From Swiss-Prot:
Record note on quaternary structure: Part of the 50S ribosomal subunit.
Organism per entry: Haemophilus ducreyi (strain 35000HP / ATCC 700724)
Region feature (Disordered): 1-52
Protein name, UniProt field: Large ribosomal subunit protein uL15
Protein's UniProt keywords contain Translocase: no
Length: 144
C-alpha cells in the first residue's frame, strides 16, 4: 500500500453540486436559488441575527453585566488543585506546567476549597487565611 494508491471508501464522498450547467443537470437556470428575491441575487442574503426588520432578539434583551479585565490575568485555585502539581514545590510556573492555569495568568490566589493531602511548599502565590491554616496543618509552608 502506498500513499498514491489510497482512495476513500465507496460512498464516503459525495460529488459536488455543479450549479447552473444546463436544465438536464437538475440544477440549471436558477441553480437551486428559486426565482427573484434578495437571496437569489449575487451577494444577496441578510446578516446574522436579522429578523426581517423586526427588532432583533439581541436588541430586545437588556445589556447585562461586564467582563472584568482583571479576570484575564488573575486566577483563584482550590486546595485540591495543588495535588495535581508534580513535586512538593508549588510556583506559578509549576501550576502552568500542570495545566491548572493558563499561560496568560500573572497572579494566583489559593483559596480554602477541597482538601490537601500532602505537605507542599507554596512560593510566590497569595493564600487566604483558611487555606494557609490548612496547608500548615498538613506540614506545608508558605514562602513569599
Amino acid at each position: 500500500m502506498r500513499l498514491n494508491s489510497l482512495s476513500p471508501a465507496e460512498g464516503a464522498k459525495h460529488s459536488a453540486k455543479r450549479l447552473g450547467r444546463g436544465i438536464g443537470s437538475g440544477l440549471g437556470k436558477t441553480g437551486g436559488r428559486g426565482h427573484k428575491g434578495q437571496k437569489s441575487r449575487t451577494g444577496g442574503g441578510v446578516r446574522r441575527g436579522f429578523e426581517g426588520g423586526q427588532m432583533p432578539l439581541y436588541r430586545r434583551l437588556p445589556k447585562f453585566g461586564f467582563t472584568s479585565l482583571k479576570s484575564l490575568h488573575v486566577a483563584e485555585i482550590r486546595l485540591n488543585d495543588l495535588a495535581k502539581v508534580d513535586g512538593n514545590e508549588v510556583t506559578l510556573e509549576a501550576l502552568k506546567a500542570a495545566n491548572i492555569i493558563t499561560k496568560n495568568i500573572l497572579s494566583v490566589k489559593v483559596i480554602l476549597a477541597g482538601k490537601i493531602e500532602r505537605a507542599l511548599v507554596i512560593k510566590g502565590l497569595r493564600v487566604t487565611k483558611g487555606a494557609k491554616a490548612a496547608i500548615e496543618a498538613v506540614g506545608g509552608s508558605i514562602e513569599e
